[in-house]
């Protein structure tokens, strides 16, 4: 059965890292007879330059028609001065919303070979393996009303709205419990229920959903405490479920526990596990075109795609094992390099993963 994947290289280092991910995907397709068809288009700044919009209508239709979307990265300083509604990031928000991608999965897994890359002591992070599940289409990033107004005294005031409906909370909570069931059977719901009305409803609905999952140990934590605990004792967590803004912040924080955001993939899924897959890192315009970016997060995003959307666990395992082999060989891109290891570029790292498959 043919599987159509929409490839969106994006901006900055996006095209470079995507080229390596496609190399790996092509090889694994041959080895496991997946029947993959690749379709290419643009998103973000590259789409603005080509279509005059960060997400063209025809691109959105291609995304809807595809079984999965693989994205590089979006954004760059050359688009900082354009209409805010046309900024690259708006294309990313729109495609997530239009495809109904409400669940963002961001693992923070520390490879043993990279234990020294973390800024925390090895005993604090060794064996780290947690998953942050972020609600992606609701909350303050999409809430209305929002804007800037001038008060009677002439002062400007900006305002945003943080709404969450019961159904939005229920579906992400259910996803959190399901993910915990596949892992260590622990779920920590992070909110700010001591201050925010939306968080009070969040906590109440999560408690209601918990009744259907008696085998899962549920805990609640305020977001400020969660940020502190991620640094103090991150291994206490298995799955964290939280809202859009809190998840945005905490997942970036958790990514650095591993030493390099260049190692971390992510998945954004709809109710049927159709998804968009992308590295956690940004477009890194400062190193774009130099051939030194780390492609491993994008390659590992391919593994997540095979696991969650296509249910090809063996193929996903093979990619993850190949990445481990390459790290065992001492190959490192600049962001994860240390004394005694071999520094390689983007293409060489991709080739090494292909060779290890």
UniProtKB/Swiss-Prot annotation:
<feature type="binding site">
    <location>
        <position position="134"/>
    </location>
    <ligand>
        <name>substrate</name>
    </ligand>
</feature>
<keyword id="KW-0464">Manganese</keyword>
<dbReference type="GO" id="GO:0051287">
    <property type="term" value="F:NAD binding"/>
</dbReference>
<dbReference type="InterPro" id="IPR024084">
    <property type="entry name" value="IsoPropMal-DH-like_dom"/>
</dbReference>
<feature type="binding site">
    <location>
        <position position="248"/>
    </location>
    <ligand>
        <name>Mg(2+)</name>
    </ligand>
</feature>
<feature type="binding site">
    <location>
        <position position="224"/>
    </location>
    <ligand>
        <name>Mg(2+)</name>
    </ligand>
</feature>
<dbReference type="GO" id="GO:0009098">
    <property type="term" value="P:L-leucine biosynthetic process"/>
</dbReference>
<dbReference type="Pfam" id="PF00180">
    <property type="entry name" value="Iso_dh"/>
</dbReference>
<keyword id="KW-0460">Magnesium</keyword>
<feature type="binding site">
    <location>
        <position position="224"/>
    </location>
    <ligand>
        <name>substrate</name>
    </ligand>
</feature>
<feature type="site" description="Important for catalysis">
    <location>
        <position position="192"/>
    </location>
</feature>
<comment type="similarity">
    <text>Belongs to the isocitrate and isopropylmalate dehydrogenases family. LeuB type 1 subfamily.</text>
</comment>
<keyword id="KW-0432">Leucine biosynthesis</keyword>
<feature type="binding site">
    <location>
        <position position="106"/>
    </location>
    <ligand>
        <name>substrate</name>
    </ligand>
</feature>
<feature type="binding site">
    <location>
        <position position="96"/>
    </location>
    <ligand>
        <name>substrate</name>
    </ligand>
</feature>
<keyword id="KW-0479">Metal-binding</keyword>
<dbReference type="InterPro" id="IPR004429">
    <property type="entry name" value="Isopropylmalate_DH"/>
</dbReference>
<dbReference type="GO" id="GO:0003862">
    <property type="term" value="F:3-isopropylmalate dehydrogenase activity"/>
</dbReference>
<comment type="function">
    <text>Catalyzes the oxidation of 3-carboxy-2-hydroxy-4-methylpentanoate (3-isopropylmalate) to 3-carboxy-4-methyl-2-oxopentanoate. The product decarboxylates to 4-methyl-2 oxopentanoate.</text>
</comment>
<keyword id="KW-0100">Branched-chain amino acid biosynthesis</keyword>
<keyword id="KW-0028">Amino-acid biosynthesis</keyword>
<feature type="site" description="Important for catalysis">
    <location>
        <position position="141"/>
    </location>
</feature>
<keyword id="KW-0560">Oxidoreductase</keyword>
<keyword id="KW-0520">NAD</keyword>
<feature type="binding site">
    <location>
        <begin position="282"/>
        <end position="294"/>
    </location>
    <ligand>
        <name>NAD(+)</name>
    </ligand>
</feature>
<keyword id="KW-0963">Cytoplasm</keyword>
<feature type="binding site">
    <location>
        <begin position="76"/>
        <end position="89"/>
    </location>
    <ligand>
        <name>NAD(+)</name>
    </ligand>
</feature>
<comment type="subunit">
    <text>Homodimer.</text>
</comment>
<dbReference type="GO" id="GO:0000287">
    <property type="term" value="F:magnesium ion binding"/>
</dbReference>
<dbReference type="GO" id="GO:0005829">
    <property type="term" value="C:cytosol"/>
</dbReference>
<feature type="binding site">
    <location>
        <position position="252"/>
    </location>
    <ligand>
        <name>Mg(2+)</name>
    </ligand>
</feature>
<dbReference type="InterPro" id="IPR019818">
    <property type="entry name" value="IsoCit/isopropylmalate_DH_CS"/>
</dbReference>
<protein>
    <recommendedName>
        <fullName>3-isopropylmalate dehydrogenase</fullName>
        <ecNumber>1.1.1.85</ecNumber>
    </recommendedName>
</protein>
<comment type="pathway">
    <text>Amino-acid biosynthesis; L-leucine biosynthesis; L-leucine from 3-methyl-2-oxobutanoate: step 3/4.</text>
</comment>
């Amino acid at each position: 059965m043919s599987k159509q994947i929409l490839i969106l290289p994006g901006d900055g280092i996006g095209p470079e890292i995507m080229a390596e991910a496609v190399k790996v995907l092509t090889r694994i397709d041959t080895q496991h007879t997946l029947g993959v068809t690749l379709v290419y288009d643009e998103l973000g700044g590259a789409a603005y330059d080509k279509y005059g919009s960060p997400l063209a209508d025809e691109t959105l239709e291609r995304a809807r028609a595809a079984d999965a979307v693989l994205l590089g990265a979006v954004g760059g300083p050359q688009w900082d001065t354009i209409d805010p509604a046309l900024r690259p990031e708006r294309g990313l928000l729109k495609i997530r919303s239009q495809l109904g991608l409400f669940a963002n999965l961001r693992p923070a897994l520390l490879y043993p070979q990279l234990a020294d890359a973390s800024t925390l002591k090895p005993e604090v992070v060794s064996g780290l393996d947690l998953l942050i599940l972020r609600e992606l289409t609701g909350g303050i990033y999409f809430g209305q009303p929002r804007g800037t107004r001038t008060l009677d005294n002439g002062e400007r005031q900006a305002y945003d709205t943080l709404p969450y409906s019961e159904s939005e909370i229920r579906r992400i909570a259910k996803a959190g419990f399901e993910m915990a069931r596949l892992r260590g059977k622990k779920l920590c719901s992070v909110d700010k229920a001591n201050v925010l009305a939306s968080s009070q409803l969040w906590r109440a609905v999560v408690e209601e959903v918990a009744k259907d999952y008696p085998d899962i140990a549920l805990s609640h934590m305020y977001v400020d405490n969660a940020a502190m605990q991620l640094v103090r004792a991150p291994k206490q967590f298995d799955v964290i479920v939280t809202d859009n803004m809190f998840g945005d912040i905490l997942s970036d924080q958790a990514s650095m526990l591993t030493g390099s955001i260049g190692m971390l993939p992510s998945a954004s899924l709809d109710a049927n596990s159709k998804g968009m897959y992308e590295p956690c890192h940004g477009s890194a315009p400062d190193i774009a075109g130099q051939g030194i970016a780390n492609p491993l997060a994008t390659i590992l995003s391919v593994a997540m795609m095979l696991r969650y959307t296509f249910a090809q666990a063996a193929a996903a395992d093979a990619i993850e094992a190949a990445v481990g082999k390459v790290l065992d060989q001492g190959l490192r891109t600049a962001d994860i390099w240390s004394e005694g290891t071999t520094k390689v570029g983007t293409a060489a790292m991709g080739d090494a993963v292909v060779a290890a498959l």
